Amino acid sequence: MSTEPSVAKDAVLKRSEALAENTPQVSGYDFNEGLDYSKLFESYVNTGFQATNLGLAIREINRMLDCRDQPLEADQIDSHETDDFIRRRSKCTVFLGYTSNLVSSGLRETIRFLAEHRMIDCIVTTAGGVEEDFIKCLAPTFMGSFELSGRDLRERGINRIGNLLVPNDNYCKFEDWVMPLLDEMLEEQKSQGTIWSPSKIIHRLGERIGDPSSIYYWAAKNQIPVFCPALTDGSLGDMMYFHSFRQPGLVVDILSDLRRLNTMAVKAVNSGMIIVGGGVIKHHICNANLMRNGADYSVFINTASEFDGSDSGARPDEAISWGKIRKDATPVKVYAEASLVFPLIVGETFAKRHHCAGKELPRETNQV
């Protein structure tokens, strides 16, 4: 009888070194114990793959909120700040960033919940993230399919965002609503010397929409600044373009917003970043936190990869190299499509705290 080759045996049966004593073991949720969603999400940390990242993101945000819940010390109260929107409010300033497609989707209601109950301190979004919120106050967005023909939809005057459908009439209604407000802003600029910035424009629109289903209605009501460094890159920019022919002269100052955003970061006792999506919103928040030598808490949610060197795909460790996240922080990136995971994360963090604290408030009746 022949013996197995020693080279093969040594290769297959190579002895292992012991792992560190505190290394967690892989373990999933046992449904024999019943259905407890909190325990289910707690089990994600040791499930592996992106379930682990999701579980760690929930932990990171809860640590962020634990810090935010602490009262300011007497010497930390920002009594000299005259801008109510950027005044320090807690021991952790929470920056929320998201892209326009999330507002087009049902995540709008998740984001509105955060603004409604003043659970965040600052928003950074894109032009679409602004206009889509207001447009939904004027007319609905519909479910469609990724496979619908673009040629047929164009002939019917229907725009597709993934598997969502937006009739072009919605943008016509938006034009009817926003043009008089742009006239009003131009008149204030001429008569009162008002210097408009993207955040001030969004605040004015939020005040005028009069609809509590709107994110920016609540941002205006709760004095949450909304920054949009690319305000003209969307339908709102289209309206401003048309307005520049009808009533030329409106000036938008982006530098004052940069100063406000960076000042919020510099003032922060601790800083937390929750960035859903990539592109300009991700870098704008991260770069503001560079001004304080990095954020203390960070969660990124997107599907981008780092192989192409894009900022969207960059892992948190790359941000640490730039000083945008602190060296001793425990940041998390969840590689997932946001509509799948962001409501779950909010449910296990912000919403759980809100409802467990008995802070449920009566909702206002929707009105346009």
Curated annotation (Swiss-Prot):
Active-site residues, record numbering mapped to chain: 324 (nucleophile)
EC number: 2.5.1.46
Keyword Cell inner membrane appears in the UniProt entry: no
Cofactor(s) for this UniProt protein: NAD(+)
Name of the molecule in the record: Probable deoxyhypusine synthase
Binding annotation for NAD(+): 100-104, 126-128, 132, 233, 278, 303-304, 337-338
Record carries keyword Transferase: yes
GO cellular component terms given for this protein: cytoplasm
Family stated for the protein in its record: Belongs to the deoxyhypusine synthase family.
GO-annotated molecular function: deoxyhypusine synthase activity
Keyword entries, A-Z: Hypusine biosynthesis, NAD, Transferase
Pathway participation: Protein modification; eIF5A hypusination
Catalysed transformations (reactions): [eIF5A protein]-L-lysine + spermidine = [eIF5A protein]-deoxyhypusine + propane-1,3-diamine
Binding residues for spermidine: 131-132, 238, 283, 309-311, 318-324
GO biological process terms, semicolon-separated: negative regulation of reactive oxygen species metabolic process; protein modification process; spermidine metabolic process
